UniProtKB/Swiss-Prot annotation:
InterPro entries: CIAO1/Cia1, G-protein_beta_WD-40_rep, WD40/YVTN_repeat-like_dom_sf, WD40_repeat_CS, WD40_repeat_dom_sf, WD40_rpt. Keywords: Repeat, WD repeat. The gene is Ciao1. Essential component of the cytosolic iron-sulfur (Fe/S) protein assembly machinery. Required for the maturation of extramitochondrial Fe/S proteins. GO terms for biological process: iron-sulfur cluster assembly; protein maturation. This is Probable cytosolic iron-sulfur protein assembly protein Ciao1. WD repeats lie at residues 12-51, 57-96, 101-140, 146-185, 192-231, 250-289, 301-335. It comes from the Eukaryota. One of its GO terms (cellular component) is metallochaperone complex. Belongs to the WD repeat CIA1 family. Transmembrane segments: none annotated. Coiled coil: none annotated.
Amino acid sequence: MGRLNLEHTLQGHKGRIWGVAWHPKGNVFASCGEDKAIRIWSLNGNTWTTKTILSDGHKRTIREIRWSPCGQYLASASFDGTTAIWSKSSGEFECNATLEGHENEVKSVSWSRSGGLLATCSRDKSVWIWEVAGDDEFECAAVLNPHTQDVKRVVWHPTKELLASASYDNTIKMFAEDALDSDWDCVATLSSHTSTVWSIDFDATGERLVSCSDDTSLKIWQAYHPGNDAGVATPDKQTVWKCVCTISGQHSRAIYDVSWCKLTNLIATACGDDGIRIFKETSDSKRDEPTFEQLTAEEGAHDQDVNSVEWNPVVEGQLISCSDDGTIKVWKMTE
């Protein structure tokens, strides 16, 4: 089995820490929390230190931060109903744009692979898609309202302009732009969870999605395209996402976040039972009936709820986590 080794415990935020996000180069990460501040951390020798504190962009808790694929921009989603765009064009990070429109808390933000689109979602049940129109200019391209409850998370597909959202209504929705009229449409609804879907993440290929829920389970979804060799029907020649695996019994409380490593294919979870768990696909797994095993469970990873986990996109096996306990932890997974 594997082992999750704690490398660093970092403090600096006041109160709970909601989100952590690696820079695309893997040598810097950002964190955010209820102190309304963003901290940018870098490795100084063998120690992670706060390089910058951004504290003038939001009036309330910052729920999530995400780096643009080019690494030049950072987007932050806040309970104040706005999304701030930060850039370092002048040498120092500055808030160059504030996106307004959501009626209340913005829960999540995500950049498309090209960096040309940004998605946000909110407690107001809507998903917004923004086009990057030029230097610090963002235009609303779509307001999507297929969810019946609070939308918790938005994540773009790793290679296509396909957006996934997870909601308090127990479903995941997929959105794509119609080639004919340029309207964004809901192209799939993924239903299997029996409670809030807190988070989702694609694998490296984008052919599979993992979801985590208040129902204490993980689900693996497989994309079936028109003409697939498994014989799965695809009405209207639309890709169908089918739940092909449910992973349950390992978590005792809600699973708040999930990260599918693009380098190792390992899945990490952040749980309300203060634990972090790592899952691996078994060697005899089948595409249409995959099986996963728990490699390791770090039961007391934090002293309170673990809110976010994310694998380093460059350094194999490195994981960061953050918690209600006010700490960030850097881990190294060894198999």
